[in-house]
């Protein structure tokens, strides 16, 4: 096998592995969320399908595949069908630039555990997260439903507001690492994780990604008591499933990015690098589940106030302070 064919085979294997692992994790994250929320609420949760309910994700998949694929009268056909894919695909594509382990050597060849080690990896992530906004917008607008439209308008405002603070919170990590390449950012944390240098940036990023995931206490676009189910009210079957699984893939991806930027990525003592990366990422996922089970929903004005008047100015101030420290200290 020549070098080009081998490179294609290696990249294909990494892509297939990421698809399998991320989709499986997303399915079982739903199961874990239902069990954890049940424990918080003093009930049992799903425990009927398979031993300890472990086959519940498979049962949910079969249910979604066999449900009617309904399209409302007056809906824009092609945009209605396109929106779920635009919500789910950017999330999983972001995993292409995340280094989920140290490079491994196989048959004398060093293979990075990363699909694409781009020198603008951070910009790639920000670009894809911006594209996901269109899935929310199109899903609400194309449904020909006032509930879906109101949900998409709220979602657009929320995602744009917190996209800004999220991006600004990552600027200090780039200043410390001197690179936009995610593998370089991980390597720069070999001695001390960036959370030690940038606790304020980490806090801003954590709040911002919670808002990006549209989870409680930031689930304004899907407020059940007001908007039924928000921008995906009119979706059913596997198209609804794409919105649903996209949300949980986004949780995993954003947890992986938080790990990469602030918790040293795959670095850690004793355990293998991939295990460290997985443990840190899943810790963020369970933090989001815990928030859903314990916190109330914010009002819309509180949401906007937090994003524009607290997090964004604080992120800008943090950039100025970081620049001053790097220049003069």
Curated annotation (Swiss-Prot):
Q: Which residues cross the membrane?
A: 12-32, 78-98, 120-140, 159-179, 191-211, 242-262, 270-290, 309-329
**GO MF assignments:** oxidoreductase activity, acting on NAD(P)H, quinone or similar compound as acceptor; quinone binding
Give the UniProt subcellular location, in the record's own words: Cell inner membrane
Q: Does the keyword Magnesium apply?
A: no
The answer to whether keyword Transmembrane helix applies is yes
Could you name the Gene Ontology cellular component terms for this entry?
plasma membrane; respiratory chain complex I
Q: What broad class of enzyme is this? A: translocase
Catalytic reactions on record: a quinone + NADH + 5 H(+)(in) = a quinol + NAD(+) + 4 H(+)(out)
Instruction: Provide a GO biological process annotation.
Output: aerobic respiration
Membrane topology term reads: Multi-pass membrane protein
What EC designation does it have? Answer: 7.1.1.-
Name the PROSITE patterns for this protein: COMPLEX1_ND1_2 (PS00668)
Instruction: Give the family, as the similarity comment puts it.
Output: Belongs to the complex I subunit 1 family.
Report the NCBIfam families cross-referenced here. PRK06076.1-2 (NF004741)
Q: What function does this protein fulfil?
A: NDH-1 shuttles electrons from NADH, via FMN and iron-sulfur (Fe-S) centers, to quinones in the respiratory chain. The immediate electron acceptor for the enzyme in this species is believed to be ubiquinone. Couples the redox reaction to proton translocation (for every two electrons transferred, four hydrogen ions are translocated across the cytoplasmic membrane), and thus conserves the redox energy in a proton gradient. This subunit may bind ubiquinone.
Q: Quaternary structure per UniProt? A: NDH-1 is composed of 14 different subunits. Subunits NuoA, H, J, K, L, M, N constitute the membrane sector of the complex.
Q: What is this protein called?
A: NADH-quinone oxidoreductase subunit H 2
> Where does this protein come from, organism-wise?
Geobacter sulfurreducens (strain ATCC 51573 / DSM 12127 / PCA)
Give the gene name.
nuoH2
